[in-house]
């Protein structure tokens, strides 16, 4: 006989002793009250989401700062070959036509 099986639990014994109805089991469970300070599942989920979002934003801020610090490597002249190598497309600046 396993003491952990539902057939041998206190609620099952109470239900059988109370006439086999669910009223005995319900009465046994009604006597147990949860303290009001236990957080609900939704509150725990919301708190976990807030923590995850805060951690994510911290990591994203670090990444943005790193990219901003490295942005000098990407500044400067870029290839403009695509502006001059298509049929008849020339770089136009101030009304004059340039090849570069």
Curated annotation (Swiss-Prot):
Give the UniProt keywords, A-Z: Growth regulation
Tissue-level expression reads: Expressed in embryos, germinating seeds, hypocotyls and pollen grains.
> What residue spans carry the region label Disordered?
1-40
Q: Name one GO molecular function term.
A: anaphase-promoting complex binding
BP terms from Gene Ontology: microsporogenesis; negative regulation of organ growth; pollen development; positive regulation of protein catabolic process
What does the UniProt entry report for the null mutant? Growth-related phenotypes, such as formation of large roots, leaves and seeds, enlarged meristem size, and reduced fertility due to defect in male gametogenesis.
**Mind telling me which InterPro entries this protein's record contains?**
SAMBA (IPR037547)
Function (record text): Plays an important role in organ size control. Acts as negative regulator of the anaphase-promoting complex/cyclosome (APC/C). Regulates cell proliferation during early development by targeting CYCA2-3 for APC/C-mediated degradation. Required for mitosis I during pollen microspore development.
Q: How does it assemble?
A: Interacts with CDC27B and CYCA2-3.
- For this entry, the protein name equals Protein SAMBA
Query: What organism is recorded for this protein?
Result: Arabidopsis thaliana (Mouse-ear cress)
Gene that produces this protein: SAMBA
